């Protein structure tokens, strides 16, 4: 099941109400940093697991 345009619109409205328009750029920036860190940790984890000898 995918999100349709109305569901996305509703989610955006809820986010605006919760965080306010002034704080939204900061929240999105923090979210982007979190996603970037998660991707980096996954990449590092894959490197470590590929360097381990097979058992």
Swiss-Prot record:
Keywords: Cell membrane, Membrane, Protein transport, Translocation, Transmembrane, Transmembrane helix, Transport. It is found in: Cell membrane. The keyword Transmembrane helix applies. GO terms for molecular function: protein transmembrane transporter activity. It is a single-pass membrane protein. It holds the Pfam family TatA_B_E. Belongs to the TatA/E family. The Tat system comprises two distinct complexes: a TatABC complex, containing multiple copies of TatA, TatB and TatC subunits, and a separate TatA complex, containing only TatA subunits. Substrates initially bind to the TatABC complex, which probably triggers association of the separate TatA complex to form the active translocon. Part of the twin-arginine translocation (Tat) system that transports large folded proteins containing a characteristic twin-arginine motif in their signal peptide across membranes. TatA could form the protein-conducting channel of the Tat system. This is Sec-independent protein translocase protein TatA. It comes from Wolbachia sp. subsp. Brugia malayi (strain TRS).
């Amino acid at each position: 099941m995918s999100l349709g345009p109305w569901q996305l619109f509703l989610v955006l409205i809820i986010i605006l109400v919760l965080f306010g328009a002034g704080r939204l750029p900061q929240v999105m920036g923090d979210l982007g940093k979190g996603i970037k860190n998660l991707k980096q940790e996954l990449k590092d984890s894959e490197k470590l697991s590929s360097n381990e000898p097979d058992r």
